[in-house]
Every structure is written in C-alpha cells, then in structure tokens.
Amino acid sequence: GYKPNRDCLEQLLSDADVIVTGYRPNSLDRFGLSPVELHNRYPGLVIGRVSAWGLSGPWAERRGFDSIVQAASGIAHIHADGTGRPGALPAQALDHSAGYLLAAGIMSALRRRHLDGHGWTVDISLARVAQELLAQPLSVPTEASPYKIQTVNARTPGGTVTCAAPAINISGGPDSYRWIGRPWGTDQPEWAEPQSASVQR
C-alpha cells in the first residue's frame, strides 16, 4: 500500500502552497521529503518546520516537546513552587508562541514568493522560543482583571464539545470552526474546498 499512498501525497503536494511539519530535523529525508528535495519537485512550496531543539547542536536529533524544553531550558526551575517541585508556563506557552512565530514566518515567505516566485523554508524551534522568552526582562506580576472566555459548542460523533471561540474576530468572517472532533481516519486525502463565511456559520 506504500506506492498508492505516496502517489496521493505527491498529488496533494503538487497543489499545496504550504506544508507544515513538526518532526526532528532530517527525520523525513529518508522519504525524499527534505526541503531540498521538496523544492526540487515543487519550486514554489513554502515549508514550515517546528522542532524541539533546532537544526544544529548536540540535541538537534533528539525528540522533544513543550514540557521537556521548559525543563531543559530552566523554565521549570524558575517557576518551581516553594517545595522545589518544578513548575511550568501556562497553556504550553512554547508550543503556542512557536506556532504564532511559524505562522508569521509562513505569511512572510508567501509574500516573498509572490514577489520572486521561489519557495522558502521557515524553521522555528521550541528551544529558541524558550531562550527568547528567558531573555526578556522580568516583570512583577499584576492581578489580571476578570475575563470571560468566549466559547462555541459543536456536536460531534463523540458528543458535544465546548471550546474557545476563534481568537480573531473579523467582521463577516467565521465565528466558529469548520471541523471539530472529527473521528481519526474519516477524512479523504484531498484539499477542502473554501467556504463562504455565511456557510461556515
């Protein structure tokens, strides 16, 4: 079943503007999916990659995720409680920050592609995000004012799901999510057709 799956992947890539991966550097190379090989086949492709430790250094090939990087970078020590038990930033802050930075980098790469026609690769690492956060000056926490989180409900095959509403609210844009709680393996390997805001609601 490998070749039909690979042919399907290549067909999807031929129509893609952006591919986003979250694997260790070089881990996809053996499948012919390195940035160099992808750009040889699809010169205009923008590739966004998130890794734990970055592209170089002794830990580059190691697996990792937000909590591990917080521990290794010293964040867990800084946020330890009075007993010395390691702490953590709220809401997997490295993952979220890296995601926002990657999205900004991809948008910049798409703009550059529009100007020069070339594909680009954008790399973000959780370790670098941690380094940048730790380099910021310390501030005294202030008491946050109460904030009511806007939520949306959706019916799914597994029941009703309540989740945070989209972070950005654009007049006339969607105010909910197109897909919530879809069972794994039920989607066809094809790009979704764009829908108007009125249909998305």
Q: Which residue stretches match the model-derived regions?
A:
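A structured beta-alpha segment of the ubiquitous adenosine-cofactor-binding alpha/beta core
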Residues: 1-40
